[in-house]
Amino acid sequence: MAALIRCCSSFSHTSGGQPPPRDKSRAPEIGKFATSIGYSVVRKPGDHPPFSKIIHSSSQPKERQGKGILQTPFASVGSLDKFSAFEGIGRLKLPVMAVLLTNSLQMATPLEALAAEICEPESSMFSMPILLLVALIGATVGGLLARQRKGELQRLNEQLRQINAALRRQAKIESYAPSLSYAPVGARIPDSEIIVEPKKQELISKLKTGKTFLRNQEPEKAYTEFKIALELAQSLKDPTEEKKAARGLGASLQRQGKYREAIQYHSMVLAISKRESEDSGITEAYGAIADCYTELGDLEKAGKFYDTYIARLETD
């Protein structure tokens, strides 16, 4: 409200100049209008520019005539007189204008609030089914995955218990006759009389060195030794030593945490055994591959290899 009246004051200052000509024919009507709202208009002829004193007609006109100019906190009466279209027209009290503008604002504001209240439920009603559908799908998928994971873990634990039981049985059997030898009776040939090729001797040396490094928890050095041994075994076309070198490479990579590369070398052991129709070392290869898949989190493949490993432990 204060902002509107200030704008009016500034407009009156900028308009300036002489007041518009007075319409004498409407003077009686102006007097009646001023008297009806409880104010009288007093004109001082000597002042320039002309202004009006607004004096209340119902209470002590003489006392108010001396100090009867209407005081307002917004703008001077002289500046408001310049803005008036007719000289000498009395003004309504400012609180009356404030009440009118306030009522108009109050009539407009509730409509906007009502429109906002009407729009909000529509958007929320449209969005709630979508949110509920997304939450329902997420809960369903999460429950299925958790149930599947739980079943795989239970199956894996059962397989590990079977492996431990088979290993304990095998250890008991071996403890009955630890010094029993199934080699034929005969004189042992001294090592000095055994003729070994230089490459074969180097191959055996690399395999022993690699095992020593594995035993000493040095898998990087063991990998280097087993790699050379594998190349020598392949050049000599010795499948038995080739499987030993491949098994050593898989073990060294497995201890370094390189499980996918380790699976490749353990699978090489299985391929050589299948090619040569010779089963030595494949039981350990199945168990090592299952361990690698377990570390990678692929429990389904790990379970398959554990099943094969358990079956071979029970038949060996």
UniProtKB/Swiss-Prot annotation:
Coiled coil spans: 144-175
Superkingdom per UniProt: Eukaryota
One GO term (biological process): chlorophyll biosynthetic process
Keyword Thylakoid assigned: yes
A Pfam family that the UniProt record links to this protein: TPR_12
Location within or outside the cell: Plastid, Chloroplast membrane; Plastid, Chloroplast thylakoid membrane
UniProt repeat feature TPR, residue ranges: 203-236, 243-276, 283-316
Keyword match Protease: no
Gene3D superfamilies: Tetratricopeptide repeat domain (1.25.40.10)
Reported phenotype of the disruption mutant: Loss of ability to restrict the accumulation of protochloro-phyllide (Pchlide) and delta-amin-olevulinic acid (ALA) in the dark, leading to a strong Pchlide fluorescence in etiolated mutant seedlings exposed to blue light. Rapid bleaching and death of plants transferred from the dark to the light, mediated by singlet oxygen production and enzymatic peroxidation of linolenic acid.
Keywords: Chloroplast, Coiled coil, Membrane, Plastid, Repeat, Thylakoid, TPR repeat, Transit peptide, Transmembrane, Transmembrane helix
Transmembrane segments: 125-145
One Gene Ontology cellular component annotation held by this UniProt entry: chloroplast membrane
InterPro entries in the cross-refs: FLU, TPR-like_helical_dom_sf
Topology relative to the membrane: Single-pass membrane protein
Transit peptide limits: 1-26
Role: Negative regulator of tetrapyrrole biosynthesis (including chlorophyll) in chloroplasts, probably via HEMA1 repression. Inhibits especially the magnesium ion Mg(2+) branch of tetrapyrrole biosynthesis, but independently of heme.
Complex and partners: Part of the FLU-containing chloroplast membrane complex composed of FLU, CRD1, PORB, PORC, CHLP and HEMA1. Interacts with HEMA1 (via C-terminus) only in the absence of light. No interaction with HEMA2.
Protein name as catalogued: Protein FLUORESCENT IN BLUE LIGHT, chloroplastic
Organism of provenance: Arabidopsis thaliana (Mouse-ear cress)
